[in-house]
A protein has these predicted regions:
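Short, flexible loop segments at the rims of nucleotide/cofactor-binding pockets, characterized by
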Residues: 23-25, 108-111, 159-165
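Short N-terminal targeting/anchoring amphipathic segment
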Residues: 71-72, 108-109, 119-139
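Short, well-ordered alpha-helical microsegments
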Residues: 28, 140-143, 192
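A short, active-site helix/loop in glycosyltransferases that binds the activated sugar's phosphate group
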Residues: 179-206
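A conserved, positively charged/aromatic
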Residues: 155-182
């Protein structure tokens, strides 16, 4: 099921959707390619934001049909790079104020995740993105949450399995990401029922 288009558009012109993915392309996630192609066939304007480089040696041939530009969201490996990325991404006073407001929450995350959230916000604004869509409510969901909090660009998230069922899932962050999302997409009725339980009281729309 495709996430809905956002009706609030902070930029002029047609909606532009930013897909936030941990890795792209990934052979085991051809369903994402299928979804992107379906949306492009409907005339939607998409951009892809990848948080990690692919390590796959083979790719689905359908990837060649994807028109969306792929953007690499830099992941700093050194402290100096992390601080540089934060500084370059927070040049606007409004962004710095929003960043300060969510700092207590960001302190729960690794620094490189925070830096990627800031960088995604910068790129999304640069590309006039009107809506973000994350696949998986884990890394991609967290980075999209940060970018949305800094820019006001709304987001949706498609949840899958490991990102909601695995023992490593942080329930606080799962609830935070889903409650602030414009909409949460579940891939099955079972998952939808499960999310209805774990997200109870958050106001999340599944």
């Amino acid at each position: 099921m495709n996430p809905p288009l956002d009706t609030h558009q902070p930029h002029q012109g047609a909606p532009r959707i930013g897909y936030v993915l941990k890795v792209y392309p990934r052979f085991s996630e051809t369903f994402i390619v299928t979804e992107i192609l379906a949306r492009e066939a409907q005339g939607e304007d998409l951009s892809i934001y990848a948080l990690r480089p692919t390590t796959d040696a083979r790719f689905h041939p359908e990837i060649a049909r994807v028109a969306a530009r792929v953007n690499w969201v830099g992941r700093p490996n050194r402290a100096i790079d992390l601080w540089s990325q934060l500084t370059e991404g927070l040049t606007r006073q409004e962004d710095r104020e929003r960043f300060a407001a969510i700092m207590p929450v960001l302190a729960e995350l690794p620094g490189d995740v925070v830096a990627q959230g800031v960088e995604l916000a910068r790129q999304a604004r640069r590309d006039s993105i009107t809506h973000l869509h994350a696949h998986f409510a884990s890394l991609a969901g967290r980075v999209a949450w940060i970018a949305s909090a800094l820019t006001g660009i709304p987001y949706t998230v498609t949840t899958h399995a490991k990102d909601i069922f695995h023992v490593s899932v942080d329930p606080v962050w799962l609830r935070r990401i889903c409650s602030d999302a414009q909409r949460v997409i579940a891939i099955s009725r079972y998952n939808e029922d499960y999310l209805g339980t774990v997200l109870a009281g958050t106001g999340a729309t599944v």
